[in-house]
Amino acid sequence: MTKPPQVLVSISICGLCLLSGCAGSASPPPPPTGDFSIVVSPPSVSTQVGGTTSPVMVSLVPQNGFAGAVNLTITGFPNGINPSPAASFILTSGTPQQITFSAPAAAGTFTVNFQGASGPLFHSASTILTVAPPPNPFLVSASYYPWYDANAWQYLDCYGGTLRGELVPSQLPMLGQYDSNDQTVVTQQIAWSIAAGINVWDLEWVPPETAPLDSVIRNVILQNLHIGDIRFAMFYDYAIRFGNDFNLTPDKVTAIISDFQYFAANYFIHPSYLKVGQGRPVVFFYAAAALNPVSAVQQMVTTLRKAMTDAGFSIYLIGDEYNPLVPPDPVRIGNWDAIFGYGPSVGYAGYSDDNGFLALHSTMYAAYQAAAQQLGVDFVPSVTPGFNDRAVRRICANNPALARRTSAAAAEGSMFNAFLTNLALPYAANSQLKMIHITSFNEWHEDTEIEPSVVTAPTTLDTSPTGSQYTQGLVYQGYGTTYLDILRTQIAGAKP
């Protein structure tokens, strides 16, 4: 049966509505979701250590009707650089925030991130912050130990633990009980070092079969994004390498040559490796003064130089020959390009105002430098903040503790300050290299470190049964950046 015309019209109209949508029944599209962006200007700022940057302007740009506030967090810079206002604040539309960065204790170039969050929304922007280290006419090398992991901080007689962990209250590193494999740790340590004037790390090294230091150096330290900010040299630890056997046999010489050939192939070619003169790679040779017989030392050095020449390098050897308890020996000194003394504490105990420690070094610095200069050998003065291994070597040794203060009432770091100002820097100024050596940046086992610690009140108490077996009644304090501040200040005031 044929439908009436009006029915066909109705069906046609409804069909068109189904195809095209009837205006009266469609829902409007949802409004755009409110959002925001972060804008940072300028793209880079700079200052130098001790200074403050020009302002960085941070703005919130609302989108699609966004009317909320944003929690803004600033990240990407190390300890020792301080934003103002603080690293977290509220940002609102129409009220840009000016940020400045002061740099009392860190240097380097960093990508600073400004991260904004509001509920589920998150956006960020960045600027480049460059903090230049202070001018430094000296080479300042500090012994650096890449051997820390969780076990290294725990007491194991002769090998593990720290004095600072046994003090009451404890005075641990500012970075905590860190792992040397952590790149953020290495970045922070480089930033602290170069800001204080340390422009060289002499890196403790023994073969991989002895300890995993080589892996940390090659795969962590030398891969760090900031390794170009500092130079490094190898610190050849003969004592650990050969188990404190100082009889220099032909087999040991062969092993030494092999080790240095490894240096030539894997380290000397690195752009940050310390070279002096006409591209001569520097190596510190630890415990050189203990090697015997002297004739074997002479032969070893001659053979070593020949092997390095064959490898394409005129090596610069700094021998550990300075011992203030022994007169200088020209026969020994003459083997090296320069001499230094890793362990200047030499068994002294107590405060330097009482024990003649600094007076001894004053006399022997003069004697050793004169003897070295007569042989055409440079003298690298060494300085230490103190020494105390009594919480680590509780059974295997009974070494005295050398205080970090000149007296109990003196300021924290006063011995280091006097050693550096009156001896190390003036003697370095009177040398060709103009170099000083610091024992150490981070040897926490022997408490020679100048790496920043947490800040605490002074104490003489420790966790030993007597309450002072480790401190020997000497004053210890969590010192923060005190030693790095002293170093930076004294370098700035020195006359090279």
Predicted regions mapped to residue ranges:
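Bacterial N-terminal signal peptides that target proteins for export
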Residues: 1-12
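Solvent-exposed, well-ordered amphipathic alpha-helical segments
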Residues: 3, 61, 71-75, 86, ...
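Intrinsic structural disorder/low-complexity segments
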Residues: 8-9, 100-101, 283
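Cysteine-centered motifs
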Residues: 14-17
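C-terminal motif of bacterial Sec signal peptides marking the signal peptidase cleavage site
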Residues: 19-21
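Glycine-centered flexibility motif
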Residues: 23-24, 50, 68, 104, ...
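Long beta-sheet-rich domains in secretory-pathway and surface-associated proteins
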Residues: 26-134
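Glycan-processing catalytic domains of CAZymes
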Residues: 133-496
